Amino acid sequence: MTSQTAHDLRADVCVLGAGIVGLWNALQYAKRGFSVVLLDELTEHSTTDYKVGESLLVFSNTFLRTIGELDDELTDSFVKQGFWMAYGLEGKTSFDDTTCEWGFLAQLPDRWRDAVADQKLVRAMAGDVQIVRPEVEATLRRTVAKIPEITFCDHGLARDLVLADGEGDHAVSWRSRDRQRGGTVSARWLIDCTGRTRFLATKLGHDLPFTDGFATGAAWGQFADCDPSVFDERWEYTFPEGRVIRRDLDTVHLWGDGYWVWVIRLTGDRISVGVTVDRAKFDEHRNLRDVFWEIVARYPLLEFLKPENLLQFHASRDVQRLSELTVSPRRYAIAGDSASIIDALYSQGLSLSLSTSWHVGNIVQADLTGAGLDTSHIDHVNRAALADWRLTRSMARWKYSDAMADSRFFILDHLLDYLVLSAALLPRFQVSRWLTETGGRPEAETPTHVLLRAKLRRTLFLTQLPPWHRVDPATVARIAEDWHRGLARRAEWRRANGIRLKPARAALRADAAVPHLWRLAFPRERGELTPKPIIEPGFVRVKGTEVSPALLVAAGNLLLAVNLAALVYDVADTAVRRAERATTRRWRAVVARGRAWVFA
């Protein structure tokens, strides 16, 4: 890499923004053999900022370990055991039988890891961690500095642009903050990774408004000197077979009425803690720092968090953005927060940012190597990416509602999210294999890798995962939105009519992946839905050399069937309860009229 402040630069690709997504994109295009100009003006604050999105999820780990060359850095990060959701923990000093919980241990059993010869593939596929963003970005910058194809124009920000018509280059005008330096970058393709500045989405009018009244604000901070001893036996969970784990080793989410708290442990005794709130339930004129500390104070388990240990604090009153476009046939693309952000799923957002950037990379590669613009691929990416963000938003939308107090909704809404994550395992394996074996360099492809990339062209989207990859992505998003909404409305009806279901808990693992949902039908007992592990036949284990491993193909289909069965039960049970209530009301009305007639 060369660091440039010259007035005029030219490259195949210009990447705007040198955050984690911008740095990754610069590396992606350099590895595809193209010249890159990376444009940004970094400051001490921007390079040390503790950004959110620390918990790697779905595809993030895969892309960062391979194209990002962060295998060693991530291996040294805080290992993510899984994720753990809880509702009803306010005012309690420990998790107990009145708390609703949903957890998943993402770490694979040793026998599964040992079955794969290429351990780099195992780490790319299943080595999720919790990262300190400025430290990871510093490593990415050092990697970028070694790449001769990348020119880092590090003294200016994009101020204006002229989009080319036809086959010409775009022209991006940049200027330093002190207005002492400026110039122009000419490039065939323009990739906007400017984050919440949203340079292209704002300038070109690609922003989509939300019209459903759901808006969220957020406040978050990173804390130092959090002694690990505070995570004592109160954080322990014992599985049915006797295995003991600690919940704090997961990415922890604590739900309450109209808010969501995340607790993410990091290396060096640091912790990231954030609160997101439904603005309809909290006075939007209140200071979000005050809201943050008020909600944290509701949890005795978090009493170790002190203002004096706060390294950095951020707050934003509006943390939802949506773009109608990811990639344009006019040869520009919008990636990361520049395109869309759905609070509070920042980690999910990073995953979507990197996966859609990879799709755009394939489009750019075809164009710059002479194959021309693949407009059908562009159309599919735009439709599927927008649908993915809608689906992601539906995952969070109703968890802020009163329905979360209903234990069945708590379980079934997370079960629906779990379906998406389970179905993603197959393309996650496929893209991990492609990236690990090619290093992101298409010239290293074999016929098998070409086949993998052809499959991923359609299925590396949340709304195009097998087994629903043949359905239009917008239809999949609408079904997901309606499904979540229906679960919430039935739960709200139960709550409004005095029906209080017993608390429930499900802690799942790769080899104990299906909760005992049948126990929800027995109201006299606590819903302990956690299954015991199953030892599978050795021949079904993933070896790492397959294109579509049978075990991963089965995962999405199995969880789809489980979700459909749970939906049928929820609809039928609630319908029966409605009918019973209606019959009881009518009978009481008849009796009341009879009494009135008798005593008239």
Where are these regions (language model features)?
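Predominantly flavin-linked oxidoreductase catalytic cores and closely associated redox partners
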Residues: 143-293, 297-300
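Short beta-strand to alpha-helix junction loop
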Residues: 121-142, 199, 282-286
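N-terminal Rossmann-like FAD-binding beta1-loop-alpha1 element of flavoenzymes
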Residues: 11-38
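Conserved Rossmann-like nucleotide-cofactor binding loop
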Residues: 21, 44, 197
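FAD/FMN-dependent oxidoreductases across multiple families
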Residues: 257-259, 265, 276-396
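N-terminal FAD cofactor-binding segment of flavoenzymes
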Residues: 46-108
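C-terminal helical "tail/cap" subdomain of flavin- and related membrane-associated enzymes
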Residues: 363-600
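Glycine-rich FAD pyrophosphate-binding loop
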Residues: 30-52
